[in-house]
Amino acid sequence: MSAIKTITKASHLIDMNDIIREGHPTLRAVAQDVTFPLNEDDIILGEKMLQFLKNSQDPVTAEKMELRGGVGLAAPQLDISKRIIAVLIPNPEDKDGNPPKEAYALKEVMYNPRIIAHSVQDAALADGEGCLSVDRVVEGYVIRHSRVTIEYYDKNSDKKKLKLKGYQSIVVQHEIDHTNGIMFFDRINEKNPFEIKEGLLLIE
């Protein structure tokens, strides 16, 4: 049975066994655009990807299902070579430990996402990046654009445009890279992983 048929079954919850790891050829392939109107499988796939991220961020569910926490997932990581990504970035608690008014800073399934504009300034996460498809720690600054404008379609086939900066920008760029066969460590300077070029914004 194909990956998409398995994952879109009503009873199936995405877990770590569904996620392919580095070295798998699908992670190095350029994914196909989805066509509109979206078919039912593509809509269900997006919903299940978002549900996986929710489950991975819930301590009880994550422990029960043995999930690694994630804020983004791309269809190619499920061995489905389509331009579909899900992003779920929680808002932090306030300084007094109270929950945020809005649970998520960004919650979206994006179909055919692409970067249509970006800043001249580069940015990187100070602690580096990780990936659900990479089981090892890869140290170094992953150089990305500080700000991006994203164009994508939602599950209703409506075209959307989103301006992102900081952490949200980094997360979405990471997931879009997966649809282009790019891994995060490709963007680390191999000879000098912690090089700070002039103007680089380090995001804590």
From Swiss-Prot:
InterPro entries linked: Peptide_deformylase (IPR023635), Peptide_deformylase_sf (IPR036821)
EC number: 3.5.1.88
Biological process, per Gene Ontology: co-translational protein modification; translation
Class in the EC hierarchy, top level: hydrolase
Binding site for Fe cation: C131, H174, H178
Keywords: Hydrolase, Iron, Metal-binding, Protein biosynthesis
UniProt protein name: Peptide deformylase
Database matches in NCBIfam families: pept_deformyl (TIGR00079)
Residues forming the catalytic site: E175
GO molecular function: metal ion binding; peptide deformylase activity
Cofactor needs: Fe(2+)
Source taxon at top rank: Bacteria
Functional summary from the UniProt entry: Removes the formyl group from the N-terminal Met of newly synthesized proteins. Requires at least a dipeptide for an efficient rate of reaction. N-terminal L-methionine is a prerequisite for activity but the enzyme has broad specificity at other positions.
Cofactor note (record): Binds 1 Fe(2+) ion.
Stated family: Belongs to the polypeptide deformylase family.
Reaction equations catalysed: N-terminal N-formyl-L-methionyl-[peptide] + H2O = N-terminal L-methionyl-[peptide] + formate
Keyword Phosphoprotein tagged: no
